[in-house]
């Protein structure tokens, strides 16, 4: 349920209504937009009498939200969320590039790539220290040693680092050392992991699963936000289709669709979608 306050409503009147709503065992999210304040009500609203809220002299209108996602819903938060990482801003019309190797393989490799990334104008450095692989015999990443190398590259370049978490038990380490925590496509519906990263203070980059719908994707973001972390960045990285020319098919339509459905920022990963270097630039453009 969404409650839109009348323009110019005093803060004390907003606080009074919020207090009454919380007495109904509802979680009340407050969004101060341009010209008005919006209250997003999360919880069991089925027994809430909309008319009793509507008659409040400071309420403009009351709307029920049919979608299962609430905190991530554009109706709850009409303005774009902007996530700040170092000097970079993601969302709200800001342009930022995240670049780096798929996996960290050596100090020389990651530091050289980091310097190139910085020189090219990218704002964040990504690199995999822990790698989810289809085959158990494939390289699984350097683990904590790779994370140490990412931290060294950050020290040399000043670029914030983005890397993937796979195990909820690593949350404390990532909270301490990583600037943006990535949840990969294979873990998009690992709900225990989502709950754990939701307790973190660091921004979360949530990749879309191989065959997940927009609603399922946003619901995964909702898991994170329900735990208190609202700094979620959605990442479209390609979906599985019948086409075999590319590794995956980049779903360009996800960008305008998500922007209409949610206030969360969305970025695309053309590298993992295409799997071919020469397609990265045209897909990104």
Regions found by a protein language model. Name each.
Residues 53, 100, 125, 174, ...:
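Conserved, mostly hydrophobic/aromatic
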Residues 126-144:
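Glycine-rich, proline-tolerant flexible connector loops at the mouths of alpha/beta enzymes
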């Amino acid at each position: 349920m969404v409650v839109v306050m009348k323009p110019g409503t005093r803060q004390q009147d907003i606080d009074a209504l919020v207090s009454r709503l919380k007495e109904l065992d509802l979680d009340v999210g407050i969004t101060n937009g341009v010209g008005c304040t919006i209250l997003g009500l999360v919880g069991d609203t089925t027994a809430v009498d909309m008319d009793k809220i509507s008659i409040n002299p400071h309420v403009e209108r009351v709307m029920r939200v049919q979608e299962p996602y609430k905190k991530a819903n554009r109706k709850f938060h009409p303005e774009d969320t902007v996530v700040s990482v170092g000097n970079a801003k993601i969302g709200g019309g800001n342009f930022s590039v995240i670049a780096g190797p798929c996996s960290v393989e050596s100090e020389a490799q990651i530091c050289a790539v980091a310097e190139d990334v910085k020189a090219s104008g990218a704002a964040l450095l990504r690199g995999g220290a822990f790698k989810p692989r289809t085959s158990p015999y494939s390289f699984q990443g350097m683990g904590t040693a790779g994370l140490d190398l990412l931290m060294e590259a950050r020290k040399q370049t000043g670029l914030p680092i983005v890397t993937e978490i796979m195990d909820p038990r690593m949350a404390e380490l990532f909270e301490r050392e990583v600037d943006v925590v990535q949840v990969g496509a294979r873990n998009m519906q690992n709900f225990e992991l989502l709950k754990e990263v939701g307790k973190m203070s660091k921004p979360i980059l949530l990749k879309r699963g191989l065959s997940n719908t927009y609603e399922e994707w946003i619901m995964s973001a909702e898991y994170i936000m329900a735990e208190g972390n609202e700094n979620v960045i959605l990442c479209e990285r390609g979906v599985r289709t019948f086409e075999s020319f590319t590794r995956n098919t980049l779903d360009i339509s996800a960008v305008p669709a998500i922007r209409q459905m949610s206030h969360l920022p969305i970025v695309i990963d053309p590298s993992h979608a295409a799997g071919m270097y020469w397609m990265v630039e045209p897909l990104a453009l």
